[in-house]
Amino acid sequence: MKKSLKELTGLIVAFALATLLFLYWPLYQRSVPKANNDAPVDVVLIGGGIMSVTLGTYLQELQPDWKIELFERLNGIAQESSDGWNNAGTGHSAFAELNYTPELQDGTIEIKRAIKIAEQFEISREFWSHQVRHGRLPAPTEFINATPHMSFVWGEDRIEYLRKRHNALIKNPLFYGMQFSTDPAIIQKWAPLLMEGRTQDQKVAATYMPLGTDVNFGVITRDLAKHLQDSQNFALHLDHEVTALRQNPDKTWNVTVKDLNNGQERSIKSRFVFIGAGGAALKLLQLSGIPESKDYAGFPVGGQFLSFENTAITKRHNVKAYGMAESGSPPMSVPHLDARKLDGKSIVLFGPFALYSTKFLKNGSWFDLYSSVNHHNAAGMLSVGKNNIDLVKYLMKQATLTDADRHAELLKYFPNAKPTDWTLVTAGQRVQIIKRDPDKGMILQFGTEIVMDKDHTLATLLGASPGASTSPSIMLDLLAKAFPQQMKNGWETQLKKIIPSYGQHINDSPALTNKIRRMTSETLSLPYLEVPDKSATPADPTIAPKNQHSTTYNANSEMQAL
Protein backbone atom coordinates (compact mmCIF):
# COMPACT_ATOMS: atom_id res chain seq x y z
CA MET A 1 0.00 0.00 0.00
CA LYS A 2 2.79 2.41 0.96
CA LYS A 3 4.60 1.56 -2.27
CA SER A 4 1.46 2.34 -4.30
CA LEU A 5 0.99 5.68 -2.52
CA LYS A 6 4.63 6.54 -3.12
CA GLU A 7 4.28 5.72 -6.83
CA LEU A 8 1.07 7.75 -7.08
CA THR A 9 2.72 10.70 -5.32
CA GLY A 10 5.65 10.45 -7.70
CA LEU A 11 3.33 10.48 -10.70
CA ILE A 12 1.46 13.52 -9.37
CA VAL A 13 4.72 15.40 -8.75
CA ALA A 14 6.03 14.45 -12.21
CA PHE A 15 2.78 15.58 -13.81
CA ALA A 16 2.88 18.89 -11.91
CA LEU A 17 6.48 19.51 -12.96
CA ALA A 18 5.67 18.62 -16.57
CA THR A 19 2.69 20.99 -16.51
CA LEU A 20 4.81 23.83 -15.12
CA LEU A 21 7.49 23.16 -17.73
CA PHE A 22 4.85 23.13 -20.49
CA LEU A 23 3.32 26.43 -19.34
CA TYR A 24 6.56 28.31 -18.64
CA TRP A 25 8.95 26.93 -21.27
CA PRO A 26 7.44 28.90 -24.23
CA LEU A 27 8.38 32.15 -22.44
CA TYR A 28 11.94 31.10 -21.57
CA GLN A 29 14.43 33.61 -22.99
CA ARG A 30 17.58 31.86 -24.19
CA SER A 31 20.86 33.59 -24.96
CA VAL A 32 21.08 35.12 -28.43
CA PRO A 33 23.84 36.75 -30.52
CA LYS A 34 24.54 40.43 -30.00
CA ALA A 35 23.39 42.82 -32.70
CA ASN A 36 25.95 43.20 -35.46
CA ASN A 37 24.93 46.79 -36.25
CA ASP A 38 25.72 49.63 -33.82
CA ALA A 39 23.48 52.11 -35.62
CA PRO A 40 19.97 50.64 -35.64
CA VAL A 41 17.99 50.29 -38.83
CA ASP A 42 14.73 52.22 -38.77
CA VAL A 43 12.23 49.41 -39.32
CA VAL A 44 12.22 45.62 -39.33
CA LEU A 45 9.23 43.96 -40.98
CA ILE A 46 8.57 40.34 -40.02
CA GLY A 47 6.66 38.33 -42.61
CA GLY A 48 6.48 38.69 -46.38
CA GLY A 49 2.72 39.07 -46.72
CA ILE A 50 0.36 41.84 -47.78
CA MET A 51 0.47 43.65 -44.42
CA SER A 52 4.26 44.01 -44.13
CA VAL A 53 4.64 44.92 -47.79
CA THR A 54 1.82 47.49 -47.62
CA LEU A 55 3.39 49.10 -44.55
CA GLY A 56 6.79 49.07 -46.23
CA THR A 57 5.31 50.76 -49.31
CA TYR A 58 3.78 53.52 -47.19
CA LEU A 59 7.02 54.07 -45.26
CA GLN A 60 9.22 54.11 -48.35
CA GLU A 61 7.16 56.96 -49.81
CA LEU A 62 6.69 58.85 -46.55
CA GLN A 63 10.30 58.52 -45.36
CA PRO A 64 12.51 57.33 -48.25
CA ASP A 65 15.72 57.77 -46.22
CA TRP A 66 14.66 55.19 -43.62
CA LYS A 67 16.45 51.85 -43.69
CA ILE A 68 13.94 48.98 -43.78
CA GLU A 69 14.65 45.24 -43.62
CA LEU A 70 12.07 42.50 -44.21
CA PHE A 71 12.50 38.90 -43.03
CA GLU A 72 10.47 36.00 -44.46
CA ARG A 73 10.92 32.36 -43.39
CA LEU A 74 9.83 30.89 -46.75
CA ASN A 75 11.70 31.15 -50.04
CA GLY A 76 9.33 33.67 -51.60
CA ILE A 77 6.97 36.56 -50.94
CA ALA A 78 3.21 36.02 -50.36
CA GLN A 79 3.30 32.24 -50.00
CA GLU A 80 0.98 32.00 -47.01
CA SER A 81 -2.45 33.68 -46.63
CA SER A 82 -1.63 36.47 -49.08
CA ASP A 83 -1.38 33.98 -51.94
CA GLY A 84 -4.44 33.90 -54.19
CA TRP A 85 -5.11 30.20 -53.56
CA ASN A 86 -4.79 30.67 -49.80
CA ASN A 87 -6.82 33.86 -49.38
CA ALA A 88 -10.52 33.11 -49.07
CA GLY A 89 -11.76 36.65 -48.47
CA THR A 90 -10.97 38.42 -51.73
CA GLY A 91 -12.58 41.72 -52.58
CA HIS A 92 -14.25 42.04 -49.16
CA SER A 93 -16.35 45.19 -49.39
CA ALA A 94 -19.47 44.20 -47.39
CA PHE A 95 -21.65 44.20 -50.51
CA ALA A 96 -22.55 40.52 -50.10
CA GLU A 97 -21.32 39.26 -46.72
CA LEU A 98 -24.50 38.90 -44.68
CA ASN A 99 -22.72 38.32 -41.37
CA TYR A 100 -21.64 41.99 -41.45
CA THR A 101 -25.29 43.11 -41.26
CA PRO A 102 -26.94 41.22 -38.38
CA GLU A 103 -30.64 41.50 -37.67
CA LEU A 104 -31.31 42.98 -34.24
CA GLN A 105 -33.91 41.84 -31.75
CA ASP A 106 -36.31 44.58 -32.85
CA GLY A 107 -36.11 43.40 -36.48
CA THR A 108 -33.95 46.25 -37.78
CA ILE A 109 -30.69 45.64 -39.62
CA GLU A 110 -27.40 46.87 -38.17
CA ILE A 111 -25.32 48.27 -41.03
CA LYS A 112 -22.56 50.11 -39.17
CA ARG A 113 -19.99 47.36 -39.72
CA ALA A 114 -20.84 47.01 -43.42
CA ILE A 115 -20.40 50.75 -44.01
CA LYS A 116 -17.05 50.78 -42.23
CA ILE A 117 -15.73 47.85 -44.26
CA ALA A 118 -17.03 49.37 -47.51
CA GLU A 119 -15.19 52.61 -46.69
CA GLN A 120 -12.03 50.67 -45.86
CA PHE A 121 -12.18 48.89 -49.20
CA GLU A 122 -12.49 52.23 -51.00
CA ILE A 123 -9.26 53.25 -49.24
CA SER A 124 -7.68 50.07 -50.64
CA ARG A 125 -8.76 51.10 -54.13
CA GLU A 126 -7.22 54.55 -53.61
CA PHE A 127 -3.95 53.03 -52.41
CA TRP A 128 -3.72 50.58 -55.32
CA SER A 129 -4.65 53.33 -57.79
CA HIS A 130 -1.77 55.44 -56.50
CA GLN A 131 0.65 52.52 -56.90
CA VAL A 132 -0.56 51.86 -60.47
CA ARG A 133 -0.08 55.51 -61.43
CA HIS A 134 3.48 55.43 -60.08
CA GLY A 135 4.39 52.14 -61.75
CA ARG A 136 4.60 50.08 -58.57
CA LEU A 137 1.78 47.74 -59.61
CA PRO A 138 1.20 46.10 -63.00
CA ALA A 139 -1.78 46.47 -65.33
CA PRO A 140 -4.85 46.49 -63.04
CA THR A 141 -6.45 43.46 -64.71
CA GLU A 142 -3.58 41.36 -63.37
CA PHE A 143 -4.72 41.88 -59.77
CA ILE A 144 -8.26 43.36 -59.71
CA ASN A 145 -11.23 42.59 -61.93
CA ALA A 146 -14.88 43.61 -61.99
CA THR A 147 -16.84 40.75 -60.41
CA PRO A 148 -20.41 41.48 -59.24
CA HIS A 149 -21.18 40.56 -55.63
CA MET A 150 -24.41 38.72 -54.81
CA SER A 151 -26.23 37.64 -51.67
CA PHE A 152 -28.46 34.60 -52.22
CA VAL A 153 -31.03 33.14 -49.80
CA TRP A 154 -34.15 30.98 -49.71
CA GLY A 155 -37.02 30.69 -47.23
CA GLU A 156 -39.56 33.34 -46.20
CA ASP A 157 -37.68 34.64 -43.14
CA ARG A 158 -34.38 34.97 -44.98
CA ILE A 159 -35.97 36.60 -48.00
CA GLU A 160 -37.55 39.20 -45.72
CA TYR A 161 -34.20 39.73 -43.98
CA LEU A 162 -32.47 40.28 -47.33
CA ARG A 163 -35.18 42.73 -48.41
CA LYS A 164 -34.72 44.77 -45.22
CA ARG A 165 -30.94 44.64 -45.58
CA HIS A 166 -31.17 45.94 -49.13
CA ASN A 167 -33.53 48.74 -48.10
CA ALA A 168 -31.18 49.81 -45.31
CA LEU A 169 -27.99 49.73 -47.37
CA ILE A 170 -29.12 51.50 -50.54
CA LYS A 171 -29.79 54.68 -48.55
CA ASN A 172 -26.00 55.00 -48.38
CA PRO A 173 -23.87 56.30 -51.27
CA LEU A 174 -21.41 53.41 -51.10
CA PHE A 175 -24.20 50.90 -51.76
CA TYR A 176 -25.95 52.80 -54.53
CA GLY A 177 -26.67 50.51 -57.49
CA MET A 178 -27.36 47.37 -55.45
CA GLN A 179 -30.38 45.53 -56.88
CA PHE A 180 -32.83 43.18 -55.13
CA SER A 181 -35.01 40.53 -56.76
CA THR A 182 -37.18 37.53 -55.94
CA ASP A 183 -37.73 36.78 -59.64
CA PRO A 184 -36.03 33.46 -60.54
CA ALA A 185 -35.58 34.60 -64.14
CA ILE A 186 -33.67 37.73 -63.11
CA ILE A 187 -31.54 35.83 -60.60
CA GLN A 188 -30.77 33.21 -63.25
CA LYS A 189 -29.60 35.97 -65.56
CA TRP A 190 -27.24 37.19 -62.82
CA ALA A 191 -25.94 33.73 -61.90
CA PRO A 192 -27.11 30.80 -64.07
CA LEU A 193 -25.37 28.11 -62.01
CA LEU A 194 -27.28 29.14 -58.86
CA MET A 195 -30.68 28.62 -60.48
CA GLU A 196 -30.41 25.88 -63.09
CA GLY A 197 -31.79 22.61 -61.73
CA ARG A 198 -33.52 24.27 -58.76
CA THR A 199 -37.12 23.27 -58.03
CA GLN A 200 -39.64 25.85 -59.19
CA ASP A 201 -41.53 25.88 -55.89
CA GLN A 202 -38.48 27.04 -53.91
CA LYS A 203 -38.76 30.74 -53.09
CA VAL A 204 -35.45 32.55 -53.45
CA ALA A 205 -34.11 36.10 -53.31
CA ALA A 206 -30.85 37.79 -54.22
CA THR A 207 -29.09 41.12 -54.24
CA TYR A 208 -26.70 42.04 -57.04
CA MET A 209 -23.99 44.68 -56.77
CA PRO A 210 -22.32 45.41 -60.13
CA LEU A 211 -19.43 47.29 -58.50
CA GLY A 212 -17.97 44.22 -56.79
CA THR A 213 -14.43 43.05 -57.54
CA ASP A 214 -12.15 40.04 -57.33
CA VAL A 215 -8.66 40.77 -56.03
CA ASN A 216 -5.48 38.69 -56.20
CA PHE A 217 -3.41 39.74 -53.20
CA GLY A 218 -0.52 37.50 -54.17
CA VAL A 219 0.09 39.60 -57.29
CA ILE A 220 -0.21 42.86 -55.33
CA THR A 221 2.19 41.70 -52.62
CA ARG A 222 4.83 40.34 -54.97
CA ASP A 223 4.84 43.40 -57.24
CA LEU A 224 4.98 45.90 -54.38
CA ALA A 225 7.83 43.90 -52.81
CA LYS A 226 9.67 43.95 -56.13
CA HIS A 227 9.39 47.74 -56.21
CA LEU A 228 10.56 48.07 -52.58
CA GLN A 229 13.80 46.36 -53.58
CA ASP A 230 14.56 49.15 -56.06
CA SER A 231 15.64 51.28 -53.10
CA GLN A 232 19.11 50.86 -51.60
CA ASN A 233 17.52 51.52 -48.19
CA PHE A 234 15.43 48.33 -48.37
CA ALA A 235 16.67 44.77 -47.89
CA LEU A 236 14.66 41.56 -48.34
CA HIS A 237 15.84 38.39 -46.59
CA LEU A 238 14.12 35.17 -47.68
CA ASP A 239 14.63 31.83 -45.89
CA HIS A 240 15.19 33.78 -42.66
CA GLU A 241 13.16 32.95 -39.56
CA VAL A 242 12.88 35.28 -36.58
CA THR A 243 13.74 33.29 -33.46
CA ALA A 244 13.99 35.94 -30.72
CA LEU A 245 13.06 39.53 -29.90
CA ARG A 246 14.82 41.47 -27.13
CA GLN A 247 14.24 45.09 -26.18
CA ASN A 248 17.33 47.10 -25.31
CA PRO A 249 17.54 49.72 -22.53
CA ASP A 250 17.37 52.49 -25.15
CA LYS A 251 14.02 51.04 -26.38
CA THR A 252 15.49 49.69 -29.62
CA TRP A 253 14.98 46.01 -30.45
CA ASN A 254 17.42 43.21 -31.21
CA VAL A 255 15.75 40.93 -33.75
CA THR A 256 17.43 37.52 -33.90
CA VAL A 257 17.06 35.68 -37.20
CA LYS A 258 18.17 32.25 -38.37
CA ASP A 259 19.34 31.71 -41.93
CA LEU A 260 17.47 28.51 -42.81
CA ASN A 261 19.99 27.69 -45.53
CA ASN A 262 22.94 27.31 -43.15
CA GLY A 263 21.41 27.38 -39.66
CA GLN A 264 23.41 30.43 -38.55
CA GLU A 265 21.84 33.05 -36.29
CA ARG A 266 22.50 36.77 -36.14
CA SER A 267 20.80 39.76 -34.53
CA ILE A 268 19.92 43.11 -36.05
CA LYS A 269 19.11 46.24 -34.03
CA SER A 270 16.03 48.23 -35.06
CA ARG A 271 14.17 51.30 -33.82
CA PHE A 272 10.78 49.81 -34.76
CA VAL A 273 9.51 46.28 -35.37
CA PHE A 274 6.32 45.27 -37.14
CA ILE A 275 5.14 41.68 -36.78
CA GLY A 276 3.02 41.00 -39.84
CA ALA A 277 3.50 37.26 -39.89
CA GLY A 278 -0.11 36.15 -40.26
CA GLY A 279 -0.91 33.22 -37.99
CA ALA A 280 2.64 33.21 -36.60
CA ALA A 281 2.25 36.77 -35.29
CA LEU A 282 0.92 35.57 -31.93
CA LYS A 283 3.99 33.46 -31.13
CA LEU A 284 6.32 36.27 -32.15
CA LEU A 285 4.36 38.71 -30.00
CA GLN A 286 4.86 36.33 -27.08
CA LEU A 287 8.59 36.12 -27.84
CA SER A 288 8.81 39.91 -27.46
CA GLY A 289 7.87 39.63 -23.79
CA ILE A 290 5.97 42.95 -23.79
CA PRO A 291 3.30 43.10 -21.06
CA GLU A 292 0.55 43.42 -23.67
CA SER A 293 1.38 39.94 -24.99
CA LYS A 294 0.09 38.35 -21.79
CA ASP A 295 -3.49 39.26 -22.73
CA TYR A 296 -3.64 37.19 -25.93
CA ALA A 297 -3.94 33.64 -27.19
CA GLY A 298 -5.00 32.18 -30.52
CA PHE A 299 -7.28 29.56 -32.01
CA PRO A 300 -6.26 28.19 -35.44
CA VAL A 301 -8.78 27.20 -38.10
CA GLY A 302 -7.97 26.01 -41.60
CA GLY A 303 -10.18 26.18 -44.66
CA GLN A 304 -10.87 24.01 -47.69
CA PHE A 305 -12.68 24.74 -50.95
CA LEU A 306 -14.05 22.86 -53.92
CA SER A 307 -12.25 24.12 -57.01
CA PHE A 308 -13.74 24.20 -60.52
CA GLU A 309 -11.41 24.79 -63.48
CA ASN A 310 -13.51 23.45 -66.35
CA THR A 311 -14.17 26.40 -68.67
CA ALA A 312 -17.67 25.07 -69.39
CA ILE A 313 -18.42 25.99 -65.76
CA THR A 314 -16.16 28.97 -65.09
CA LYS A 315 -17.30 30.94 -68.15
CA ARG A 316 -20.91 30.78 -66.88
CA HIS A 317 -20.23 32.06 -63.37
CA ASN A 318 -18.68 35.54 -63.13
CA VAL A 319 -20.02 36.63 -59.71
CA LYS A 320 -19.27 36.12 -56.04
CA ALA A 321 -22.44 34.64 -54.55
CA TYR A 322 -22.62 34.60 -50.74
CA GLY A 323 -25.22 32.64 -48.81
CA MET A 324 -26.21 32.57 -45.17
CA ALA A 325 -24.96 30.23 -42.47
CA GLU A 326 -27.23 27.30 -41.68
CA SER A 327 -29.36 27.67 -38.55
CA GLY A 328 -27.24 26.82 -35.52
CA SER A 329 -23.95 27.15 -37.43
CA PRO A 330 -21.40 29.88 -36.64
CA PRO A 331 -21.08 32.85 -39.03
CA MET A 332 -17.68 31.57 -40.18
CA SER A 333 -19.52 28.79 -42.04
CA VAL A 334 -21.11 31.21 -44.55
CA PRO A 335 -20.92 29.42 -47.94
CA HIS A 336 -20.03 31.21 -51.14
CA LEU A 337 -19.63 30.31 -54.80
CA ASP A 338 -16.77 32.56 -55.91
CA ALA A 339 -15.58 33.55 -59.35
CA ARG A 340 -11.81 34.02 -59.13
CA LYS A 341 -8.89 34.77 -61.40
CA LEU A 342 -5.84 32.78 -60.31
CA ASP A 343 -2.65 31.99 -62.20
CA GLY A 344 -4.12 33.81 -65.19
CA LYS A 345 -7.14 31.49 -65.35
CA SER A 346 -10.81 31.79 -64.40
CA ILE A 347 -11.58 29.58 -61.39
CA VAL A 348 -14.72 28.98 -59.34
CA LEU A 349 -14.35 28.10 -55.66
CA PHE A 350 -17.07 26.85 -53.31
CA GLY A 351 -16.74 26.73 -49.54
CA PRO A 352 -15.42 27.17 -47.03
CA PHE A 353 -15.22 23.89 -45.18
CA ALA A 354 -13.43 24.21 -41.86
CA LEU A 355 -10.26 22.20 -41.40
CA TYR A 356 -9.04 21.33 -37.92
CA SER A 357 -5.35 21.96 -37.53
CA THR A 358 -3.02 22.97 -34.71
CA LYS A 359 -0.80 24.81 -37.19
CA PHE A 360 -0.71 28.61 -37.15
CA LEU A 361 0.55 28.70 -40.75
CA LYS A 362 -0.13 26.47 -43.73
CA ASN A 363 3.62 25.78 -43.75
CA GLY A 364 3.79 25.81 -39.96
CA SER A 365 4.30 23.19 -37.26
CA TRP A 366 1.71 20.89 -35.69
CA PHE A 367 3.10 22.14 -32.35
CA ASP A 368 2.24 25.81 -33.04
CA LEU A 369 -0.91 25.84 -30.91
CA TYR A 370 0.68 23.98 -28.00
CA SER A 371 3.78 26.17 -27.97
CA SER A 372 1.58 29.28 -27.72
CA VAL A 373 -0.05 28.05 -24.49
CA ASN A 374 1.51 29.43 -21.30
CA HIS A 375 0.62 30.25 -17.71
CA HIS A 376 -0.84 33.61 -18.78
CA ASN A 377 -3.46 32.22 -21.16
CA ALA A 378 -4.03 28.51 -20.46
CA ALA A 379 -7.01 28.93 -18.12
CA GLY A 380 -8.55 31.56 -20.36
CA MET A 381 -8.31 29.32 -23.42
CA LEU A 382 -10.18 26.57 -21.57
CA SER A 383 -12.84 29.10 -20.57
CA VAL A 384 -13.24 30.26 -24.18
CA GLY A 385 -13.64 26.65 -25.27
CA LYS A 386 -16.36 26.11 -22.66
CA ASN A 387 -18.23 29.23 -23.79
CA ASN A 388 -18.04 28.25 -27.46
CA ILE A 389 -19.25 24.66 -27.39
CA ASP A 390 -21.33 25.24 -30.55
CA LEU A 391 -18.22 26.35 -32.43
CA VAL A 392 -16.25 23.37 -31.12
CA LYS A 393 -19.04 21.00 -32.20
CA TYR A 394 -19.15 22.62 -35.63
CA LEU A 395 -15.40 22.16 -36.13
CA MET A 396 -15.57 18.55 -34.95
CA LYS A 397 -18.42 17.87 -37.38
CA GLN A 398 -16.50 19.52 -40.21
CA ALA A 399 -13.54 17.25 -39.49
CA THR A 400 -15.69 14.20 -40.27
CA LEU A 401 -17.07 15.45 -43.60
CA THR A 402 -16.77 13.14 -46.58
CA ASP A 403 -16.66 14.15 -50.23
CA ALA A 404 -20.32 13.15 -50.44
CA ASP A 405 -21.13 15.53 -47.56
CA ARG A 406 -19.29 18.39 -49.27
CA HIS A 407 -21.07 17.70 -52.54
CA ALA A 408 -24.42 17.77 -50.75
CA GLU A 409 -23.61 21.29 -49.49
CA LEU A 410 -22.52 22.33 -52.97
CA LEU A 411 -25.85 21.24 -54.50
CA LYS A 412 -27.64 23.89 -52.42
CA TYR A 413 -25.81 26.56 -54.45
CA PHE A 414 -25.01 24.70 -57.67
CA PRO A 415 -27.86 22.20 -58.17
CA ASN A 416 -26.48 20.70 -61.39
CA ALA A 417 -22.95 20.15 -60.09
CA LYS A 418 -21.36 16.72 -60.51
CA PRO A 419 -18.75 15.19 -58.18
CA THR A 420 -16.37 14.93 -61.13
CA ASP A 421 -16.52 18.71 -61.64
CA TRP A 422 -14.41 19.67 -58.65
CA THR A 423 -11.25 18.97 -56.67
CA LEU A 424 -10.71 19.68 -52.97
CA VAL A 425 -8.07 22.35 -52.26
CA THR A 426 -6.67 23.51 -48.93
CA ALA A 427 -6.47 27.26 -48.34
CA GLY A 428 -4.45 29.16 -45.74
CA GLN A 429 -4.66 29.08 -41.95
CA ARG A 430 -6.53 31.64 -39.85
CA VAL A 431 -5.76 32.27 -36.18
CA GLN A 432 -8.73 33.79 -34.38
CA ILE A 433 -7.91 36.14 -31.52
CA ILE A 434 -8.46 35.15 -27.91
CA LYS A 435 -7.98 38.21 -25.70
CA ARG A 436 -8.50 39.26 -22.12
CA ASP A 437 -11.55 41.48 -21.63
CA PRO A 438 -11.51 43.60 -18.44
CA ASP A 439 -15.07 42.55 -17.60
CA LYS A 440 -15.50 39.06 -19.08
CA GLY A 441 -12.02 37.60 -18.86
CA MET A 442 -10.71 35.75 -21.90
CA ILE A 443 -13.04 36.02 -24.93
CA LEU A 444 -12.96 34.96 -28.56
CA GLN A 445 -12.67 38.08 -30.73
CA PHE A 446 -13.17 38.11 -34.48
CA GLY A 447 -11.72 40.60 -36.92
CA THR A 448 -8.22 42.07 -36.75
CA GLU A 449 -6.44 43.99 -34.01
CA ILE A 450 -3.23 45.98 -33.73
CA VAL A 451 -1.31 45.25 -30.52
CA MET A 452 1.40 47.76 -29.62
CA ASP A 453 3.81 48.23 -26.75
CA LYS A 454 3.57 51.34 -24.58
CA ASP A 455 6.74 52.81 -26.14
CA HIS A 456 5.34 52.57 -29.68
CA THR A 457 8.40 50.59 -30.79
CA LEU A 458 6.78 47.24 -31.62
CA ALA A 459 3.44 46.51 -33.27
CA THR A 460 1.71 43.26 -34.14
CA LEU A 461 -1.32 42.55 -36.28
CA LEU A 462 -3.47 39.71 -34.97
CA GLY A 463 -6.62 38.17 -36.41
CA ALA A 464 -7.97 37.31 -39.83
CA SER A 465 -11.06 38.87 -41.37
CA PRO A 466 -11.50 41.03 -43.41
CA GLY A 467 -7.71 41.18 -43.48
CA ALA A 468 -6.03 41.63 -46.85
CA SER A 469 -8.93 43.48 -48.46
CA THR A 470 -8.57 46.31 -45.96
CA SER A 471 -4.78 46.17 -45.53
CA PRO A 472 -4.12 49.80 -46.64
CA SER A 473 -6.67 51.05 -44.09
CA ILE A 474 -5.30 48.83 -41.31
CA MET A 475 -1.77 50.05 -41.99
CA LEU A 476 -2.99 53.67 -41.93
CA ASP A 477 -4.27 53.01 -38.41
CA LEU A 478 -0.90 51.53 -37.49
CA LEU A 479 0.97 54.58 -38.83
CA ALA A 480 -1.20 56.87 -36.70
CA LYS A 481 -0.61 54.80 -33.55
CA ALA A 482 3.08 54.03 -34.01
CA PHE A 483 4.33 57.32 -35.47
CA PRO A 484 2.13 60.15 -34.10
CA GLN A 485 4.94 62.72 -34.22
CA GLN A 486 5.84 62.01 -37.83
CA MET A 487 2.17 62.13 -38.79
CA LYS A 488 1.91 65.68 -37.42
CA ASN A 489 5.19 66.76 -38.99
CA GLY A 490 4.39 66.13 -42.63
CA TRP A 491 3.21 62.57 -43.14
CA GLU A 492 -0.48 63.50 -43.07
CA THR A 493 0.02 65.94 -45.94
CA GLN A 494 1.81 63.28 -47.98
CA LEU A 495 -0.83 60.67 -47.16
CA LYS A 496 -3.51 62.85 -48.74
CA LYS A 497 -1.66 62.44 -52.04
CA ILE A 498 -1.74 58.65 -51.64
CA ILE A 499 -5.25 58.46 -50.15
CA PRO A 500 -7.20 61.53 -51.36
CA SER A 501 -10.06 60.78 -48.95
CA TYR A 502 -7.70 60.63 -45.95
CA GLY A 503 -9.37 62.16 -42.88
CA GLN A 504 -12.86 61.98 -44.39
CA HIS A 505 -15.68 59.42 -44.42
CA ILE A 506 -16.45 58.57 -48.03
CA ASN A 507 -20.00 57.47 -47.19
CA ASP A 508 -20.88 60.89 -45.75
CA SER A 509 -21.35 62.48 -49.15
CA PRO A 510 -22.53 61.33 -52.59
CA ALA A 511 -20.21 63.96 -54.07
CA LEU A 512 -17.18 62.53 -52.27
CA THR A 513 -18.20 58.97 -53.16
CA ASN A 514 -18.44 59.97 -56.82
CA LYS A 515 -15.13 61.83 -56.79
CA ILE A 516 -13.16 58.95 -55.25
CA ARG A 517 -14.85 56.14 -57.16
CA ARG A 518 -14.58 57.95 -60.48
CA MET A 519 -10.85 58.36 -59.95
CA THR A 520 -10.16 54.78 -58.82
CA SER A 521 -12.47 53.23 -61.42
CA GLU A 522 -10.61 55.03 -64.19
CA THR A 523 -7.19 54.00 -62.89
CA LEU A 524 -8.14 50.39 -62.09
CA SER A 525 -10.33 49.84 -65.19
CA LEU A 526 -13.42 49.13 -63.08
CA PRO A 527 -17.11 49.99 -63.70
CA TYR A 528 -18.46 53.23 -62.27
CA LEU A 529 -21.93 54.36 -61.22
CA GLU A 530 -22.75 58.02 -60.56
CA VAL A 531 -24.55 58.42 -57.23
CA PRO A 532 -27.37 60.97 -57.57
CA ASP A 533 -27.45 63.34 -54.61
CA LYS A 534 -31.21 63.15 -54.14
CA SER A 535 -31.45 59.37 -53.81
CA ALA A 536 -28.40 58.43 -51.79
CA THR A 537 -28.04 60.52 -48.69
CA PRO A 538 -26.25 58.52 -46.01
CA ALA A 539 -28.48 56.81 -43.49
CA ASP A 540 -27.69 56.92 -39.81
CA PRO A 541 -26.19 53.46 -39.24
CA THR A 542 -28.23 51.36 -36.86
CA ILE A 543 -26.18 50.59 -33.78
CA ALA A 544 -27.13 47.71 -31.55
CA PRO A 545 -27.97 48.70 -27.97
CA LYS A 546 -25.24 47.38 -25.71
CA ASN A 547 -27.53 45.10 -23.74
CA GLN A 548 -28.48 43.19 -26.89
CA HIS A 549 -25.05 41.59 -26.98
CA SER A 550 -24.40 41.25 -23.26
CA THR A 551 -25.05 37.50 -23.16
CA THR A 552 -22.17 36.55 -25.46
CA TYR A 553 -18.61 35.88 -24.37
CA ASN A 554 -17.27 36.78 -27.82
CA ALA A 555 -16.51 40.10 -29.51
CA ASN A 556 -17.28 41.08 -33.10
CA SER A 557 -19.02 37.77 -33.84
CA GLU A 558 -20.25 39.14 -37.15
CA MET A 559 -16.61 39.26 -38.31
CA GLN A 560 -16.22 35.48 -38.29
CA ALA A 561 -14.74 34.17 -41.50
CA LEU A 562 -12.61 31.38 -42.88
Swiss-Prot record:
One Gene Ontology biological process: tricarboxylic acid cycle
Extent of Polar residues compositional bias: 545-562
EC number: 1.1.5.4
Record's keyword annotation contains Oxidoreductase: yes
UniProt entry tagged with the keyword Flavoprotein: yes
Gene3D superfamilies in alphabetical order: D-Amino Acid Oxidase, subunit A, domain 2, FAD/NAD(P)-binding domain
Catalytically driven reaction(s): (S)-malate + a quinone = a quinol + oxaloacetate
Biochemical pathway: Carbohydrate metabolism; tricarboxylic acid cycle; oxaloacetate from (S)-malate (quinone route): step 1/1
Highest taxon listed in the record's lineage: Bacteria
Listed PANTHER family: L-2-HYDROXYGLUTARATE DEHYDROGENASE, MITOCHONDRIAL (PTHR43104:SF2)
NCBIfam families from the UniProt entry: mal_quin_oxido (TIGR01320), PRK05257.1-1 (NF003603), PRK05257.1-4 (NF003605), PRK05257.2-1 (NF003606), PRK05257.3-2 (NF003611), PRK13339.1 (NF009875)
Protein name per its UniProtKB record: Probable malate:quinone oxidoreductase
Gene name linked to the record: mqo
